[in-house]
Amino acid sequence: MITISLCMIVKNEEEVLARCLDSVADLMDEIIIVDTGSTDATKEIAARYTDKIYDFKWTGSFSDARNYSFSLATQEYIYAPDADEVLDEENRAHFRKLKEVLLPEIEIVQMKYRTVTEYNTVLNIANEYRPKLFKRLREFTWVDPIHETVRIEPVVYDSDIEILHKPTGMHSKRDFGVFERLVRNSGELSPKLFKMYIRELYLTGDKTDLSNAEDYLMHLSDTTMDVDVKKSVDSVLLKNYRLNGREYDFLKTFAKAIVNEPCAETCYEAGLFYMSKEDYAEASLWLYNAANETECLIDIHSSGDKALENLINCYMKMGEGYEDLIAVASQKLKDWKLPEESVII
């Protein structure tokens, strides 16, 4: 049976920490808690489960804190949960079985990740695989009988364990602060972080968050970029202009965005814009396109339930004669659901 160190970084998690640790503590051989500046009872709660509680001065980087927590581990594998995650009884049993049978060559175990509250800022699927269990010390091996080389890709196992993500609020404001600092300091983001920033801005950004990002996004919009990236940036700018009442900038950007085939988010923003003007006929055209004729790039809901709900509202506002269209859209809304899962690492 393998041994596991739980390594968790925390800050002000008194509301959820005990719930998380109650679900996993007996599965762990070591529990390490790294606190980045709690002002509530987080550390006192953690002390009920372990004496390995360490303070870490916040650097503005979650990776720095996680790397420090990993450096303290002493067991064969490291499990890295967040405080708002939980294992139910079925998945506790799966985890216990995994400890018993995991092959020593496995270096990363992925687990299904399902958000079960409304506070889902980045997922366009019901659940996804995420790397959660890591071999602490990696052994390098040679491969191929001739022209041999060292294997650098990790050996990854996709388990049947499902982690329940149960946040009690949005983390977007915290995340936006990190993104904005990175942009100020370096002027750019990695492709992965850029994608996450765009998605969080579009899904949860308010007027201030969107305004803060405008200069950065305008700079990107003026550069040569992939077509889909350009569409994503324009969609966020459209939301910014719509929420901040900048009609001229909205229409100017929208006119350019529809020269090529628009994405669902662009059509959805147009629908909301015309709804705000009480032009429900025009709004319905763009919402229909969002729900039926275009592909989403950022937010699957913009081509799914949100587009359909607003489309139905437009038809209802337009009065008699739209009963059949309402029925069709209502049935499609009833049938709509998030895709179940995809595999990422």
What are these regions (language model features)?
Residues 3-5, 30:
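Cell-envelope/extracellular polymer assembly enzymes that use nucleotide-activated donors
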Residues 7-27:
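Short, well-formed alpha-helical segments that are part of the catalytic scaffolds
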Residues 44-68, 72:
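Conserved donor nucleotide-binding strand/loop of the catalytic core
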Residues 23, 35-45, 58, 82:
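A conserved acidic beta->alpha catalytic loop
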Residues 15-18, 40-49, 90:
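Acidic helix N-cap motif at the loop->helix transition within catalytic regions
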Residues 64-70, 81, 87-212:
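Catalytic-site signature of metal-activated, phosphate-bearing donor transferases
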Residues 78:
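Short aromatic/hydrophobic "clamp" motif used to bind/position activated sugar donors
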